[in-house]
Amino acid sequence: MSIESIKAREILDSRGNPTLEVEVWTSEGMFSAKVPSGASTGIHEAFELRDGDKSRYFGYGVLNAIVNVNNLISPTLKGMRVDNQKAIDDKMIELDGTKNKSKLGSNAIVGVSMAVARAAASIKGVPLYRYISQLAGNSNIRLPVPCFNVINGGKHAGNRLPFQEFMLVPIGAPKFKEALRYGSEVYHSLKEIIKERYGLDATNVGDEGGFAPNLTSPEEALTLLVDAINHSGYQDVIKIGIDSAASEFWNPKTSKYDMDFKNIGSSHLKSSLNSGEQLMSRYLEILKKYPIAFFEDPFGEDDWENHGKITAAIGNKIQIIGDDLLCTNPERIKKAISEKTVNSLLLKINQIGTLTETIEAAKLAKEAGWGCLVSHRSGETDDHFIADLVVGLGTGEIKSGAPCRFERLSKYNRLMKIEEELEKLHRSNGNSFEYAGEEFYHF
């Protein structure tokens, strides 16, 4: 089955910002994908093309990216077989001709790449996750541990919390469906605790469905999570993940971290400025007091030294995950492997721009013995591509926000459906699969 045409249109994401929906048309029908977008983005990510026309959507329109899909990518890929993913992705990279996909826009390229994969899975008569597993050469089909972002801070919320995400990680659940139930129950317990301590208006939610009460310190947020976990009776099965998104409060010129960066004028207050060593000490204290599963982006996106130090200190106990540090970029991943900078990769398909490169990044992580956490973006749609991606790659962990807001739940609900399909296959022909559980960081 060959590509007949490709069309893109402008739609809105979960933050009300423009993004692309891409349609790949073939003789067998139309296959589409919707493109996510981040708020806290790394400077080393593939380039997301925006129009810059302040008279439309404050400059965030994507009409130029749409033109690139319709007028450049479509005629170039016309006639190519949809089941030749690498050739299609390579052709788009060649057509773009830049190191960071800034000519066509990563948002244009990734939408096509995702839609092509859906078309190929259809002609092969297999679910998307099975097709991705074939592309990746992965036979270890398993359901991931979900990481629910239930307290929002950083750039995702209007409070003064410096760290961006505080997550529930139900590693002790027996299956994905139960992990989702555990997360939902703790989420509702947390809502009641926040309402009791901070008032009803403190239960408003942030970009990813998590609560954003007026907290000022990470320890306040962690104590709330522990109380909610204990109240729900899951103290032995749920751990906590933290995404500091430290690049947002790191000054690379001074190498200082402003823990009160959202308080206007705080940059002049010495008490809020931390050195890398001071921030490291805080992480170590947090690890002593709370049931931590991982730290994501604990330091700035080019602070290789302190990432390496924290990995050397506690990398044998928990995951140290690189997001802004690595940007799903194979070259940066190779450097981090060589220098032992982190021990896990955050995998975002739109950070690098094609499915082929995403699979390559995951393979590098696997070969290095790293963990690999598949991730959504803060600006999401109802597209659940990453649910099939995480199962197909078998990475064992996914984060898609809180168990709230449909653009988040679409991924979790898709994973429940996949689990049901795999259970049915297991009963009928013995096909094996598993829930990652406590082995979530090994794949």
From Swiss-Prot:
Pfam families: Enolase_C (PF00113), Enolase_N (PF03952). Keywords: Cytoplasm, Glycolysis, Lyase, Magnesium, Metal-binding. GO terms for biological process: glycolytic process. It catalyses: (2R)-2-phosphoglycerate = phosphoenolpyruvate + H2O. Its EC number is 4.2.1.11. It comes from the Eukaryota. The active site is at E208, K348. Mg(2+) is required for catalysis and for stabilizing the dimer. SMART domains: Enolase_C, Enolase_N. PANTHER family: ENOLASE. NCBIfam families: eno. This is Enolase B.
